[in-house]
Swiss-Prot record:
Its cofactor is Zn(2+). Binds 2 Zn(2+) ions per subunit. GO terms for molecular function: hydroxyacylglutathione hydrolase activity; metal ion binding. Monomer. Belongs to the metallo-beta-lactamase superfamily. Glyoxalase II family. This is Hydroxyacylglutathione hydrolase. It comes from Marinobacter nauticus (strain ATCC 700491 / DSM 11845 / VT8) (Marinobacter aquaeolei). The keyword Hydrolase applies. The lineage of its organism: Bacteria, Pseudomonadati, Pseudomonadota, Gammaproteobacteria, Pseudomonadales. It catalyses: an S-(2-hydroxyacyl)glutathione + H2O = a 2-hydroxy carboxylate + glutathione + H(+). One of its GO terms (biological process) is methylglyoxal catabolic process to D-lactate via S-lactoyl-glutathione.
Length: 263
């Protein structure tokens, strides 16, 4: 199996999972068709399944054109969604089977209300796999366009509970921007400073900073560290200044999210 990031727009990644024996390819959140079609053509692969995490156009805009090229495409997307192009709709607890890999569907509302993620404990490249759209990023999380802090905190808890070695394939290259905020929020965190330098080096060489892992995000990502003393202290100081609620894990998360929104 190969997982390949196809760049789209200015900072999207369209993840393509290919069975190298058959050439069959699963595509996650194709916001644009052309870069995917070019990749498939250049590689000699063919698309047979699309996974949609949520309805935003930069995740769904290429579906119709891909379907025109591959009329038998299975298009999997969330139920009760503004996106109406799915041939198969799924919700939390459902399974999607592709080329011997079983993906469990997780409900992760917050960024949008219809947001889902796809997790498989079938190891690809020696790791379980998570396609999480815009819920979790490297050192960040999705902005709350539709959901509440309580919903997003619960969704991130769901992802945080996955095995530490789970490879996290998010949909955007936001890492350096996220790290600028994280370093501002936690200026004494030496691990963040070291990680920022490593990510700058990757980007200077044209390399993606994704995938990350659940374990790495638990150590570094301020949006997952609501029980970390350093993050709690920063959140309480911020909450006092901005008259926000304190005293719970969700309140810590909400303070960090509020801080990022106003950074």
């Amino acid at each position: 199996m190969r997982i390949h990031p196809v760049p789209a727009f200015s900072d999207n990644y369209i993840w393509c999972l290919t069975n190298l024996e058959s050439g069959k390819t699963l595509i996650v959140d194709p916001g644009q068709a052309k870069p995917v079609l070019d990749y498939l053509s250049d590689s000699g692969f063919s698309a047979d399944t699309i996974l949609i995490t949520h309805h935003h156009p930069d995740h769904t805009g290429g579906v119709k054109e891909l379907q025109q090229q591959y009329p038998d495409l299975r298009i999997v997307g969330p139920t009760d969604s503004p996106f109406k192009g799915a041939t198969n709709t799924v919700h939390a607890g459902d399974e999607v089977v592709w080329e011997g890999i079983t993906f469990n569907v997780l409900a992760v509302p917050g960024h949008t209300l219809d947001h889902i993620a796809y997790y498989s404990d079938t190891q690809v490249n020696d790791k379980p796999v998570l396609f999480c759209g815009d819920t979790l990023f490297v050192c960040g999380c999705g902005r709350l366009f539709e959901g509440t802090p309580e919903q997003m905190h619960t969704s991130l808890q769901t992802l945080r509970d996955l095995p530490d070695n789970t490879a996290v394939y998010c949909a955007h290259e936001y890492t350096l921007a996220n790290l600028r905020f994280a370093r501002h929020w936690l200026p004494e965190d030496k691990a963040l400073a070291e990680f920022e330098n490593a990510c700058k080096d990757l980007r200077e060489r044209g390399k993606p900073t994704v995938p990350t892992t659940i374990g790495q995000e638990k150590q570094l990502n301020p949006f997952l560290r609501w029980d970390d003393a350093m993050v709690i202290e920063a959140a309480e100081n911020y909450s006092t200044t901005h008259r926000l609620a304190t005293g719970s894990d969700c309140a810590v998360f909400a303070a960090v999210r509020h801080g990022k929104d106003n950074f």
